A protein has these predicted regions:
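Short glycine-rich loop/turn motifs that provide flexible caps or phosphate-binding loops at active sites
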Residues: 49, 83, 96, 174, ...
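A contiguous, low-structure linker/loop signature
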Residues: 71-132, 151, 157
Length: 308
């Protein structure tokens, strides 16, 4: 008997055998929807191609007014560069100084050209005043899940200041190369920073219990073996990912770790991530037969995704 899309995807995520391989995309790019699919939304795109739906929606957060008053975000101007891209400068005012970043918006994506944190002292300002939610509201997730029905699953993003994990988030704040050099030169300082970041994520994740979402997406390309060595990830990535993954599991969520890069040299570390699912962008040639024999029974692969 044919499974529903929801049954199919959840079966695959449990390392079971669905009636067929689930078919989905890792999010629809607005540029693609606008320019290649006639402006349809993600719901219409999934339906058009007969895919299994994976809808991204996260909780709404409520903050203490005093915390927000100590973290005033202003756009200080917008300009157009020589390529026609819109450039914006953001300034954040806190009681202990200001932080600044520059963001470029293209038709396809947005990216930072000036990191928010330039020096280590900037992190201490950030750490003291970056607002952490006091309450969560799952209404947007429940509304989406009611609409979705058995057509697929709900994926959420964690509360993290950059992407999905402490190491990746710090790289987006401080720069990947600078973050790597800090780990080599001042490992204790980097551990202090990563601990501060993960503590904020854990505080919010404690409020995620009973979320209607099915999965949370963590990680990022900065944790892959394309960017750092497996030993570097073992020290500065794995311990923090394990802690937040464990708490997400306690909240009833599947966890997908996106390394978005090389993974084969660090498969033993993937196993240590616990019951997470891991997504890489390794080539199709990286099939289970290539895995070390000690690891092979503990992972399941389906087109670039490893489930532990």
């Amino acid at each position: 008997m044919a499974m529903t899309s929801r049954e199919r995807m959840l079966t695959a995520l449990k390392n079971g055998r669905p009636d067929r391989l689930p078919c989905q995309v890792h999010g629809w790019m607005p540029y693609y929807l606008k320019n290649y699919l006639g402006g349809m939304d993600q719901w219409q795109a999934f339906e058009r191609f007969g895919m299994d739906y994976a809808i991204y929606v996260s909780p709404l957060y409520s903050y203490d007014e005093k915390d927000m008053a100590n973290w005033l975000v202003e756009c200080k101007g917008s300009e157009t560069d020589e390529s026609g891209n819109r450039c914006e400068i953001y300034q954040i005012t806190t009681p202990k100084g200001t932080l600044r970043k520059k963001v470029v918006h293209t038709d396809v994506t947005s990216y930072d050209t000036e990191y928010l944190l330039k020096e280590l002292k900037d992190f201490e300002v950030w750490n003291a005043y970056y607002p952490v939610p006091r309450a969560v509201d799952f209404t947007p997730i429940q509304v989406t899940k009611d609409r979705l029905g058995d057509k697929g699953i709900i994926r959420s993003h964690p509360f993290s200041p950059g992407q999905g994990s402490p190491w990746q988030s710090f790289c987006t704040l401080f720069g990947t190369e600078a973050s790597i050099m800090l780990g080599m030169d001042e490992p204790e300082t980097l551990h202090h920073i990563l601990e501060s970041i993960v503590e904020k994520t854990l505080r919010v994740t404690e409020m995620w219990r009973n979320t209607p979402a099915d999965m949370v997406e963590v990680g990022g390309g900065a944790g892959s073996s394309t960017v750092i060595s497996p030993n570097f990830y073992r020290e500065f990535g794995l311990p923090y990912d394990q802690r937040q993954n464990a708490l997400f599991h306690e909240a009833g969520l599947k966890v997908v770790n996106h390394f978005c890069g090389g993974l084969m040299p660090m498969l033993d570390l993937v196993v240590e991530l616990s019951r997470s699912s891991t997504r890489s962008k390794d080539p199709r040639s990286c099939e289970p037969a290539a895995y070390p024999s000690a690891i092979r029974p503990r992972v399941h692969a389906a087109r670039g995704r490893l489930r532990v």
